[in-house]
């Protein structure tokens, strides 16, 4: 059986206004900035029970991992409030800042109320995460179900004349190209944004960003349709400049990473990825190269 290797490479009508979410969803009340060296964990809700008994147990890349179970957990009665819910700031380790693991416990009974959770720190700039009602973490404030927010940032922060042409599983696909494209909902921390109502059980979001001050193909911010296929797990998506990729985080990090590969049959390789959420077979194949023992590329089917 030859040895193989796998590599990663890595039309006229008034414009329609994009609908706005509630003020709480659209923009948080001002709170103090996250101090350097700290990470802010936002919690939408807390487990049932007396808050005086609830604790946040932390480990991995934090300055002081929790000790003395269960009473040694950080008391959640000291958590602060904002429009999202609660938040608590955690001092990070100076040695390594890749992952924070946590759980909420009952500091009296010792019950683990959430199960073990973790937050992957995708980029050095990442200093916040938002935990939803099911205690799943997000790199952005999750929005109400039935909506997705498209965020677009460009290098000069100029968002004049920008509109979004919407299609696929949106409740109201755009009509009358190009004037029927949706105006932006507003400007937020991740640039211009559009709040888009979705069909029930929506899976696929398609959109094109247009500069209405231009004409023809020059209107398009970039020539390809934007596509996003993981609406089940994400309520905000992020694009920037002329990059055609749609990201599920505001740090524009591609989270599809090849973790390992092994040859299991003469013509078969089993590959393990960090996630395949929202990735098509075609997209995956584009990013993979398989070579035989002589360094010749092998066709992937």
Q: Model-derived features: where do they sit?
A:
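Surface-exposed loop/edge segments in extracytoplasmic proteins
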Residues: 62-75, 110-116, 170-181, 215-222, ...
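Short, surface-exposed alpha-helix to beta-strand junction/turn motifs within ectodomains of secreted
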Residues: 52-65, 160-177, 267-300
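The feature marks proteins involved in alpha-glucan
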Residues: 14, 19-49, 80, 91-156, ...
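Tryptophan-paired
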Residues: 63-96, 171-201
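Acidic surface patches and DE-rich sequence motifs
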Residues: 60, 82, 106, 132, ...
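Short, ordered beta-strand-loop transition motifs
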Residues: 34-35, 77-84, 144-145, 184-190, ...
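Sec-dependent, cleavable N-terminal signal peptides
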Residues: 1-17
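Non-catalytic beta-sheet/beta-sandwich ligand-binding modules that flank or precede catalytic cores
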Residues: 83-95, 191-199, 205-206, 252-301
